[in-house]
Amino acid sequence: MYSTFSANFDTTIDASRDRSATPVTAPRPKRNQVARACDWCRLNRVRCDDKQPCQNCQNRGGSCSNTKPQEATSLPAANREMQRLRNKVKDLQDQIAKLKEGAEIQAQTGFATPPLSDAAHTSFDFAELTNTTEGWQGLQQTGQIHYGPLSSSYFVSRISRYLSQALNEPIEDAKLEACMARFHYIAPSHQPSRWDASPASQADQPQDGTEEAEDLTRSQEEHFLNLLWQSFHCVYPILDEREFQQYYESLWSSSPDGMSTRKPSALVDVLLAVCMQYSSTFFVSDDNQQGDTDSEWQAKHANLASRTYYQRAQRLLQSELENPTIMVVQSHIYSIVYLYNTSLLNTAHINLGATLRIAHALRLHIRPLDGTSPEQQELQRRIWWALYRIDSQLSMTLGRPPLIQLSHVSCGLPGDDREHARLSGTVLLTNHEDISWLSFHVQCTKLIFLVQGVQTAFNRKCSQLLNGDKVKDLYEDPRLLETLAEFLGQEMTAIHNWVQNVPQSLCNPRKGGSDPFSTNRDALNLSAYSPLWLQRQRLLLELHYHHLVISTLRPFIRFPPVSSSMTPLTDGYNISCLNHAMAITSILNQVLSETDLLRGWSPIFQYQWDAILCTLGFVLANSVCPPTPSARKSLQTAIRTLDLVSDHFLAAKNAAQVVREVSCQADRLVKNVQQGLTRRQAPRASQALSTRAQNPRQASNQTSFVAPAQPGVRSNSLKRALPPTTLEVSQHQPMPNFEARMQLMDMMPIGSLSELSPSLGTTESMSMPSVTSADMVIGTEAQWLHASAMILDSWTTNS
């Protein structure tokens, strides 16, 4: 044992000596470790790495389990995964914050955010430059100004075509106009002034002293400007009243000849033009039966002077285009208001395009810079969103694309609380805590934004259904129109929400206790104790709402309506559109008869005219229909309303006469229906009586409806006049088919039709139809039509 131990000991010593003699090498580097090797590397017991896929799997060209999402199997791995998710959430929150900052109006209204522009995409597809997909363009003719299918002009063209075909008259004889002011249109002419751009331009003008507008004294100008602050300023709050008063004072104090003349100012001139145009309606006396009275001469002189001041302002603005200021934008906005009140809509739309470019140059569409005073920030916001309101209103009226794209806008909505009202520079006090004088502007902006979104979605849906076919018309396919009606019902929810959220102090109370913005035509409870500006804002907001709904639902009126029961939603929208039109007529008739709140307010005349066109269209398309008598009564009320304003709005008198003439044409269509029934009444009645005499038992076992006649015998005029309805099948008695009801109409007396569609000649004939005659003509469909109207309008009447 000792020998063995000694031998091993010697060997150990020798080995240690050998190791000490050899040089010491560096320790091997520690290999990189991974939390978990991939499945292939772990199976083959080879090193793996953190790459995805790992290097081994990438070299062999196989799949690697590292590319799949890994679950955290240890605490460090879980911490790393949590940190990665935190970073991702932070990035997403930053993106959301940028979107909210760029489109604050979407967050406040809750409507869908408009799509981003193509410039935001990183990849470009040049196929989009040759995209020929178009939506519903309607029936257009070359060489004419384009008006979209949702515009009043296009609706007038549809009515004119239908009357031409139904009465076999040339379409050139149609007397309807899309704009009521065109019934008394006077082309503007140039009026020379000492403030023209150059002396040479003055020499070219006719030197007629009667056409030269006299310069007003300071007291006369202030007399007109005082009308501004409780009228247009409450609707378009784009001025700071304190700043304007200081600016106006400087124009007189710094004039060359002291205080006798004022320095040239485009803003003051255009404000004087708008106020003179507005005040021209106040010169008319009560007794104007003796021709051209002194008051009428004063009104014409005021209109002429307003036109002169407008033209002078435009010449002054031309010299300021290269270096514009906020005041230039304000001047252009009131120029557009002047043109809109004169019903020069195309001119106003073109002027708006230049105004928006000036606003872009002044960066009004972008969030105000830091360091700008709160007063100026709010003023810039109010100016920009006033431009947005005007752009949307003109674009929807003319049926053209809007000029403002909200994807490029980062200017938030202005405030409307008491603090923002204090910053505005205007003192208009009210006892209501939930509103200020700026609330009307904010609510109008939200409403127009929502309606424009609904109409944009409607056009997009039309484009999808038509697939770019420019020739195909929506009215050729009733099922396609019904699909659009179903789609529109979903989009109208946003407008319903707006109605529910309007501040109560901005709503008009009703005498019958019904809800504001309803269509039941209850009389308004006009409060004499509310401020004048607040009463006017309430009326204009509700009228504006009804007018926008009319423009949205108007395309569903068809000429002539289909005689099948395929389109219940479309038919319901016809009645709903009629209800909103009659609501406008009822409100305007009451307000203009009892008060002077809207006297001289030109836009309301266009609201009334669009309501008349909608009502006329419904009567022409549905000569025999339960709501038709109410529609014809509403036409009589509208004529009386036009007569009320004809003393100071000359076009109203001619427009009322045109309504009477078109109503007579509607009577002719009803007479055609009656004549068609007269020709078929006697032979079919005798045939039915002989049939019952031959088969008394069979007749007694059947219902009271006679057997259907041949389809080809039906009168075309009757088929055109009957309304589109649905069939309600009773659980206790089988519903007769369409042919059976047509034969029943042939058996009924002709006098019942006059009850359903009375003549417009006298007011006494406007009595509501009896239940018996309505049920005889339309059966249970009358109940459906009334129910549809209540269902579709329930979102405006229920709180």
UniProtKB/Swiss-Prot annotation:
It comes from the Eukaryota. One of its GO terms (biological process) is DNA-templated transcription. GO terms for molecular function: DNA-binding transcription factor activity, RNA polymerase II-specific; RNA polymerase II cis-regulatory region sequence-specific DNA binding; zinc ion binding. Patulin was originally used as an antibiotic and specifically trialed to be used against the common cold, but it is no longer used for that purpose since it has been shown to induce immunological, neurological and gastrointestinal effects. Genotoxic effects of patulin with dose-dependent increase in DNA strand breaks in brain, liver and kidneys have been detected in mice. However, more recently, it has been proposed that patulin might also have anti-tumor properties. GO terms for cellular component: nucleus. The lineage of its organism: Eukaryota, Fungi, Dikarya, Ascomycota, Pezizomycotina. It comes from Penicillium expansum. Residues 199-208, 687-705 have a biased composition (Polar residues). Residues 38-64 bind DNA. CDD domains: fungal_TF_MHR (cd12148), GAL4 (cd00067). Transcription factor that regulates the expression of the gene cluster that mediates the biosynthesis of patulin, an acetate-derived tetraketide mycotoxin produced by several fungal species that shows antimicrobial properties against several bacteria. Pfam families: Fungal_trans (PF04082), Zn_clus (PF00172). This is Patulin cluster transcription factor patL. Keywords: DNA-binding, Metal-binding, Nucleus, Transcription, Transcription regulation, Zinc. Pathway: Mycotoxin biosynthesis; patulin biosynthesis. Disruption phenotype: Completely abolishes the production of patulin and shows significant slower colony expansion. Leads to only marginal expression of the patulin gene cluster. It is found in: Nucleus.
